[in-house]
Structure formats: structure tokens, C-alpha cells
Amino acid sequence: MTTDGSTNGSNSGNDSVSVSVLGLGAMGGALATVLVKAGHGTTVWNRSPGKADGLVALGARAAATAGDAVRSGDLVVVCLFDHASVHEVLDPLAGDLAGRTLVNVTTTSPEQSRELAAWAERAGITYLDGGIMAVPQMIGAPGSSVLYSGSADAFRRYEPLLDLWGTSDYFGEDAGLASLYDLALLAGMYVMFAGFMQGAAMVAPAGVTARDFASRAAPWLTAMTGAFQEYAAVIDGGDYTVEGQQSLEFSDLGDILAAGSAQGVGTDAVAMVQGLIRRQIDAGHGTEGFARIYESIRRPA
């Protein structure tokens, strides 16, 4: 299920929903700001004082304690430092949370999300887990998205409100799926960024600035993302001999490694990919397509 989030005027989303936001770091503050500006009655709480001042000026109510905040909201949004922080704050408040809906957008692992969902179920709390695919400045703007899993009823009930933050994607009742998808997407992002850093380091000794390299890398890498669906079709089909693919032998990255070394820079990022390629070549699959490195990752040695 996917919806297109927007913030068109006040009272957007679910009318008459009282919301409490626990955690006013950069992300929590951004989430709360969107809710307040949309006209929702919003109570906010943060461990350290002062962070609520700007939100209070916009119309939010600052709670003196986390318990006060929880008791003030039908919907409780938690955006804290980590999984341990969530339990530290919420465990003493399980009774107050009973009968309410908890949306946890704290960064957690899939297993931690499932554990928290089980804790919530035992306490009579409706649980929805969220993975935010945006930086704080993007919340409520085009390009922002939030991945959800957990209670389908909670997602349907509060979907209009959740859409205020960005496009809402729901992945099912397994509370860990949103986190898993979130981390998988971040894995792709960080490997891509590492590739950019590798390239920028390689050309730097030749007097090329990172900014100049970026102006060429961005359109090139954007164009290359068109291959994702082609690779996906090969992976899902399980046949790496399909014609039209670049072979693993042709994809050998020895020249890139040599060039990087000649420039006097590290080549760890490329060496990682080369290792995935060589494993398949050494196993006798050199004439098969590049997508086969998926098997090096899917079934590690």
C-alpha cells in the first residue's frame, strides 16, 4: 500500500487526533513540527529541557514528563536515540500506553522491532513500526517517505495523519519488515556513497576536485540505476546465463584496483566488489552475468 503524502493546509490528516511525540532531536522535532502546523493537538516531551520551546511557540504543549505526554495522546510517536532508550522511557509507562497506538520511528533492527511489538502486545498497546527514508529537512516535503509495518488497523486508521510526513508505504503485519527494508535501502545507499568517495579519491592526485568529480558522477550513477530492474529480473529468474549480460570475466576490476594503487589511494571499496566477482569466477561461473555476485552475498562462504 502506498500513499502520496502532502501538507496541504491545516487540519490535514485525521481530524481530532491528539498526538504525543516523545523525543525532540532533529528528526523528532521535524515530525512534531509538521503535526502542529497541520493543526493537530500535539504534546511534546524531551529528556533535556529547552528543545520544546520552538514547538510551543508554534502551538504545541510541552509535557513535564514522558508519562504526562503519553496520557495526553491517543497516538504516541516515539523517536528516541536507540532501542534501549525506547524501553528505558516506555517500560515504566506500559500501563498508561495500554489501549493507545504506539508508532515507533526510532532506528532499530528488525529483531528489535519484533521484540518491541511483542512487548506492546503483552501490554495491550497497538504497535506500528516506522523507518524514515528522509533527513529531517525533508519531512513533510516531496521526496520524503516512511516505511511501516505492524498493526494493519493502526496504519489504516492513522494513514491520513502519517501521510503528512511523506509517502507512506505499508509492508504488512510483521513488525520487523519496515526496519529490514529501511536498512536494506541504506545498505545500497552507503555502498553507492563509498563508490563515489573511491572515485573522488582516485582523481584527487590529478588535481580534480571532489565537486568537479561529483558533477560527472551524479548523472552517470543516476543513469546506471536503470539497470536495477534488469538485474532484478535475472536474480529472480535464477538464470545468470541469460544473453545480453556483461560477463563476470569482463567485469573483473583489476584495472581499477591497479589505477587506484598507482594514484596512491586505498582501494578497499573496489576490492570488496572484486572479491565478490572473483569468488564466482573461481567457482567456474566466469562466463555468466555480473548479477551473479548476488550469490556471493546471498550465500556467504
Regions found by a protein language model. Name each.
Residues 2-78, 136:
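NAD(P)+-binding Rossmann beta1-loop-alpha1 motif at the extreme N-terminus of oxidoreductases
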